[in-house]
């Protein structure tokens, strides 16, 4: 089946204090007894105006085969928002999942100038980029054929 799980890495807003960071995903990853997801996709600031979704560094290093699969699907679907170029590594909710042995990637919208500013609102969203993200996710749900 398909599970939707919602986390916010900045649970308490203290990204400099790792005791209060990634709480939801750390709890989820620590309580997987009897349950093992095949893979996980984290959506992180996707769809912002001026952003591109590139190959997030931690995902590319630790889940390269799954990252290859997802970006190949995006290319096959002619989704231009997803650029198969290297991106910086991120400490985010995919990391506890990776540490738990789950193939996890962070689809990250790089170069989002409005992040954590008063302009970080609905007007900063690019509808076409959100739509491309939805097309990719729908494809992954209906046509998923990834094996570790």
Question: PLM features: residue spans?
Answer:
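Acidic/histidine-rich catalytic neighborhood of metal-dependent amide-processing enzymes
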Residues: 1-65
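Active-site-adjacent substrate-binding region
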Residues: 39, 46-148
């Amino acid at each position: 089946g398909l599970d939707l799980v919602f986390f916010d890495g900045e649970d308490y807003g203290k990204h400099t204090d790792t005791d209060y960071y990634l709480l939801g995903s750390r709890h989820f990853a620590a309580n997987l007894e009897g349950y093992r997801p095949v893979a996980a996709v984290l959506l992180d600031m996707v769809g912002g105006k001026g952003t591109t979704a590139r190959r997030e560094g931690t995902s590319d290093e630790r889940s390269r085969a799954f990252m290859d699969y997802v970006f190949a699907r995006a290319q096959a679907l002619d989704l231009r928002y997803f650029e198969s170029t290297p991106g910086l590594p991120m400490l985010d909710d995919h990391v506890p999942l990776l540490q738990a042995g789950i193939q996890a990637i962070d689809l990250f919208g790089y170069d989002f100038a409005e992040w954590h500013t008063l302009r970080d609102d609905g007007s900063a969203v690019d509808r076409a980029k959100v739509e491309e993200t939805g097309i990719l996710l729908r494809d992954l749900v209906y046509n998923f054929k990834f094996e570790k």
